[in-house]
A protein has these predicted regions:
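Short S/T/G/P-rich N-terminal loop/turn motif that feeds into the first structured element of a domain
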Residues: 1-56, 61-72, 95-98
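C-terminal structural segments of small proteins and small subunits
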Residues: 67-92
Length: 98
């Protein structure tokens, strides 16, 4: 079974306090669901080909099903409720190569 990854790029953070509160709830919820943070970068080391200088987070899961379950878990949904509209971001779940 191929691993899966959350790839999250933050276009803007409008409310740093809400973002910090989200992080305090999201990290344990993600880890409880089996997520392993691989990248938590405030900015890329270098961008190419029109790349944007955006905060990026990559989290590994054992499968797509587990990645989706983590997103849909009660703990992560509570973190999203706290986050509200304080950020503009793109979160996608991608399957790794098997």
């Amino acid at each position: 079974m191929a691993k899966a990854y959350w790839v999250v790029c933050y276009k803007s953070i409008k409310n740093p306090e809400k973002f910090a509160a989200y992080g305090k709830l999201a990290a344990p919820a993600i880890q409880a669901a089996g997520g392993r943070f691989l990248v938590r970068a405030a900015a890329p080391a270098k961008t190419y080909e029109g790349g944007l200088n955006q905060r990026t987070v990559v989290t590994e899961f054992d499968s797509v099903a587990k990645a989706i379950a983590a997103h849909d878990s009660a703990g992560y949904q509570e973190a999203l409720r706290v986050l509200g509209d304080s950020v503009e971001r793109d979160l996608r779940i991608v399957e790794g190569l098997s």
